[in-house]
Swiss-Prot record:
Biased composition (Low complexity): 234-245
Spans annotated as Disordered: 75-115, 216-278
The name this protein goes by in its record: Putative UPF0607 protein ENSP00000383783
Family (UniProt): Belongs to the UPF0607 family.
Annotated Basic and acidic residues bias: 75-101
One Pfam family cited in the UniProt record for this chain: POM121
Length: 341
């Protein structure tokens, strides 16, 4: 008899052990409870119904998703350069000096005004930077500074260079634009921070009739232009390239050397026949006999030398064998004599 413990979970509160009942084991099959049926029992297949309805997904359009981006506002402050103030001071001092000297003629004034206007337009077009997208006030300030610079530069250039005082000039020591300078003088250095490209452009636009005829003034733009090192290197290397190109052209222009055709071989015999036998030097019969005899003697001597070597080798071998045999006999005789004694 076996006693099994069967717990009774019905009606027991939590944290309290159920009472133990001792009873004999039953032969009946254990019954599956509702809790254990999911673990030990067979699972029935679950059927999922098919979806019969249709769903329409509404996606937002691309135009609605576009978000306008705001550009940041850029504030640029333009500072007046120090060069403008310095140039203004120079212009004022030069204007006072011109007033002291005296007024010029109407023709000279008209020519100078036209030249200054063209020069100012050229310099303003040359110094005009890229347009800035910003305040209108900033653009106006930049344009004013540029025009002031251009006018000041033109006035300083023509007041210093075109009105050169000399003792040979007839009217008050000032040369007009139409008359040539008898003694060309050294021109002063240009204003710092300004290039001479506008002067060159003015020379091309106005022509030779409206400009002074002095050679020194005409050569200012070409002499005072800044030369780049790359341009200098190319100018130095250009003569060598030109020389090599000309030599290459000469080589190409020369006609190619024509190879002369080689004459065909002139055979002294027919093609079917072979070449004639080689010619030996003519010798007398006595000389032939002597040469043959010398050859025979040489052969005999060589043969005799070989025979002698063979004989010597054989004789040396025989002599060695004889000596060995004699030594053995002596040893045997000595042993036999000692045994008899």
């Amino acid at each position: 008899m076996r006693l099994c413990l069967i717990p009774q979970n019905t009606g027991t509160p939590q944290r309290v052990l159920p009472p133990v009942v001792w009873s004999p084991p039953s032969r009946k099959k254990p019954m599956l409870s509702a809790c254990n049926s999911m673990m030990f029992g067979h699972l029935s297949p679950v059927r999922i119904p098919h979806l019969r309805g249709k769903f329409n997904l509404q996606l937002p359009s691309l135009d609605e998703q576009v978000i306008p981006a705001r550009l940041p506002k850029m504030e640029v402050r333009a500072e007046e350069p120090k060069e403008a103030t310095e140039v203004k001071d120079q212009v004022e001092t030069q204007g006072q000096e011109d007033n002291k000297r005296g007024p010029c003629s109407n023709g000279e004034a008209a020519s100078t005004s036209s030249l200054l206007e063209t020069q100012g337009n050229l310099t303003s077009s040359w110094y005009n930077p890229r347009p800035l997208e910003g305040n209108v006030h900033l653009k106006s300030l930049i344009e004013k500074n540029q025009t002031d610079k251009a006018q000041v530069h033109a006035v300083s250039f023509y007041s210093k260079d075109h009105e050169v005082a000399s003792s040979h000039s007839p009217a008050g020591g000032i040369l007009s634009f139409g008359k040539p300078d008898p003694l060309p003088t050294v021109l002063p250095a240009p204003v710092p921070g300004c290039s001479l490209w506008p002067e060159k452009a003015a020379l091309k636009v106005l022509g030779k009739d409206h400009l002074p005829s002095s050679p020194g003034l005409l050569m200012v733009g070409e002499d005072m232009q800044p030369k780049d090192p790359a341009a200098l290197g190319s100018s130095r290397s250009s003569p060598s390239r030109a020389a090599s190109h000309s030599s290459h052209k000469r080589k190409l222009s020369e006609p190619p050397l024509q190879l002369q055709p080689t004459p065909p071989l002139q055979l002294k015999w027919d093609r079917d026949e072979g070449p004639p036998p080689a010619k030996f030097p003519c010798l007398s019969p006595e000389a032939l006999l002597v040469s043959q005899a010398s050859q025979r003697e040489g052969r005999l001597q060589q043969g005799n030398m070989c025979k002698n070597m063979r004989v010597l080798s054989r004789t040396s071998k025989f002599r060695r064998l004889r000596e060995l045999l004699r030594r053995r006999k002596k040893r045997r005789q000595g042993r036999c004599g000692s045994s008899h004694l």
